[in-house]
Each structure stands twice: as structure tokens, then as C-alpha cells.
From Swiss-Prot:
Protein name: Meiotic recombination protein REC114
GO cellular component, one term: chromosome
Lineage: Eukaryota, Metazoa, Chordata, Craniata, Vertebrata
Keywords annotated in UniProt: Chromosome, Differentiation, Disease variant, DNA recombination, Meiosis, Oogenesis, Spermatogenesis
InterPro entries documented for this protein: REC114L
Illness the protein is tied to: Oocyte/zygote/embryo maturation arrest 10: An autosomal recessive infertility disorder due to abnormal fertilization of mature oocytes, with development of multiple pronuclei or absent pronucleus, and early embryonic arrest.
Localization terms from the record: Chromosome
UniProt record, GO biological process: DNA recombination; meiotic DNA double-strand break formation; oogenesis; spermatogenesis
Pfam families: REC114-like
UniProt record similarity statement: Belongs to the REC114 family.
Function description: Required for DNA double-strand breaks (DSBs) formation in unsynapsed regions during meiotic recombination. Probably acts by forming a complex with IHO1 and MEI4, which activates DSBs formation in unsynapsed regions, an essential step to ensure completion of synapsis. Required for spermatogenesis. Required for oogenesis.
Record's subunit section: Part of the MCD recombinosome complex, at least composed of IHO1, REC114 and MEI4. Forms a complex with MEI4; the interaction is required for MEI4 stability. Interacts (via C-terminal domain) with MEI4 (via N-terminal domain). Interacts with IHO1. Interacts with ANKRD31; the interaction is direct.
Disordered as annotated region, ranges: 157-190
Species the sequence originates in: Homo sapiens
Encoding gene (name): REC114
Length: 266
């Protein structure tokens, strides 16, 4: 996963190679005691981290944008600052996502170190923010299942217009948006999107409930992987790979394996 830093927004990608959604805010969970060794900030049955570092989208600090590119890379930018960056390919082993209305909660566990961050989508209206969230969930569903606690199924058309809601019959188990069978979805077709149900009389769900759902299961559904690449797409793809701090180590391992294979042939 890439660390926050200053990076150019121009990745050499065309509009058809990347999907973007505006965010109202991004928040990162900060462990309550930074002097302790890093570890899971949430465990089943315990209270969530008390501190969140919040980034608001504005002209002064920079507008927040969530981007998913054709290579499967996921980014969150504020202006030219990279806040999050990782590949969704194979993320089923360390990533979980929960949706609540127009918000997404992400939980990652890598080498026994866990962290949480969340985003809230923006729009000119509440309906448009929900539509942006639904569209992003459908894109994420190409790689990983998005979980929804005790949800109502909301069917949205990914074209301008208000969403239509229908009640879900199953209220005793967590809902999820399954991964999609293909990467090319037409915006004029209806997309099924899932939102969380009303966990309280005012229709709100606590962060504790979301976190418990996020960390309840060790098993995640199979990720959808796509590998249709043309030679002309290698440049932008390599630029994206170089933004991942783990990529140089991966290249070294590949070189070692290639040398082993070359030695066997000789």
C-alpha cells in the first residue's frame, strides 16, 4: 500500500481507463496509544478507535477524489496529495469493505497490522451522493464483495435520476454486493446496489456495528481478476506500480526467480 505523499495527478490515463468519484470527506483511524507497537485497532467485542483524522474536501486543502483505474489500482487523492493507494487485485486476503448509505468503511490487515479508513461521497444532492456511492460499489464489486449489515436492497440506475428503493426480505443476516462477472458495465443498464438498513429508529448505524460486521469473518469471497492488457497500456500501468512502496521488492523477487530459471536452462 502506498503511503501518503505528494504525487502528480496526471497518471497518463484517459477517461476510459479510470473512474472517479468526488468525496465529501476522508477519515483515517488513529490508534489511541501511538507509543504501543502497531496492531489491530479493532477487535470483536471491543470499542472502536476513539480518534479519527478527518480530511474535508475544499478548495483550500484540495478536493477529495476516489479513483479506480483499469489496472485495478485504487487511489484517494486530496488535490495532488495521495492519501491511499493499493491494488484491488488479490485484495480478498487483506481487505474488507462495508457500506452504510453514502459511506464506505475500509479495513486492511497486512502482516498482522490492521487499520481502518472511511470515505463519504459528495454530490449536489443527497440522491446524487448515494448514486456516486452505488456506482463506486459496483466498480469495487468487480474485485471484492462489499458487505452491508442488515440491509435493504436499493436499486439504482447509474444515470441522472433519483434512486428507487425496495425492501429486502432478509433482515437477519448481513447483505453484500457480489462481485460482477465482467468489467464492462453499461451505464444505461440497471445496477443492483445494496445499502444498510435502519439499525436504529433514526436510521443510523453506529461505527461499532460497522466495525463488528467488517471484522466478523476471516473468509472473503473470491476476487474478480482481469488481465486483458495491450502493449500501449504498459507505461501508465508501470507508473501506477511505482506508486506502490512494495513494488521494488516484488521486482527483486521476480529477478531472483528469473535467474533461477535461467540457471536451470544452462
Amino acid at each position: 500500500m502506498a503511503e501518503a505523499g505528494k504525487v502528480p495527478l496526471s497518471l497518463g490515463l484517459t477517461g476510459g481507463e479510470a473512474a472517479e468519484w468526488p468525496l465529501q470527506r476522508y477519515a483515517r483511524c488513529i490508534p489511541s496509544n501511538t507509543r504501543d507497537p502497531p496492531g489491530p485497532c479493532l477487535e470483536a467485542g471491543t470499542a472502536p478507535c476513539p480518534t479519527w483524522k478527518v480530511f474535508d474536501s475544499n478548495e483550500e486543502s484540495g478536493y477529495l477524489v476516489l479513483t479506480i483505474v483499469i489496472s485495478g489500482h485504487f487511489f484517494i487523492f486530496q488535490g495532488q496529495t495521495l492519501l491511499e493507494g493499493f491494488s484491488l487485485i488479490g485484495s480478498k486476503d487483506w481487505l474488507k469493505i462495508v457500506r452504510r448509505v453514502d459511506c464506505l468503511l475500509f479495513g486492511t490487515t497486512i502482516k498482522d497490522k490492521s487499520r481502518l479508513f472511511r470515505v463519504q461521497f459528495s454530490g449536489e444532492s443527497k440522491e446524487q451522493a448515494l448514486e456516486h456511492c452505488c456506482s463506486c460499489v459496483q466498480k469495487l464489486a468487480q474485485y471484492i464483495t462489499v458487505q452491508v449489515p442488515d440491509g435493504n436492497i436499493q436499486e439504482l440506475q447509474l444515470i441522472p435520476g433519483p434512486p428507487r428503493a425496495t425492501e429486502s426480505q432478509g433482515k437477519d443476516s448481513a447483505k453484500s454486493v457480489p462481485r460482477q462477472p465482467g468489467s464492462h458495465q453499461h451505464s444505461e443498464q440497471q445496477q443492483v446496489c445494496v445499502t444498510a438498513g435502519t439499525g436504529a429508529p433514526d436510521g443510523r448505524t453506529s461505527l461499532t456495528q460497522l466495525a463488528q460486521t467488517l471484522l466478523a469473518s476471516e473468509e472473503l469471497p473470491h476476487v474478480y481478476e482481469q488481465s486483458a492488457w495491450g502493449a500501449e497500456e504498459l507505461g501508465p500501468f508501470l507508473r501506477l506500480c511505482l506508486m506502490d512502496q512494495n513494488f521494488p521488492a516484488f521486482v527483486e523477487e521476480v529477478e531472483k526467480e528469473l535467474k533461477k530459471l535461467a540457471g536451470l536452462r544452462n
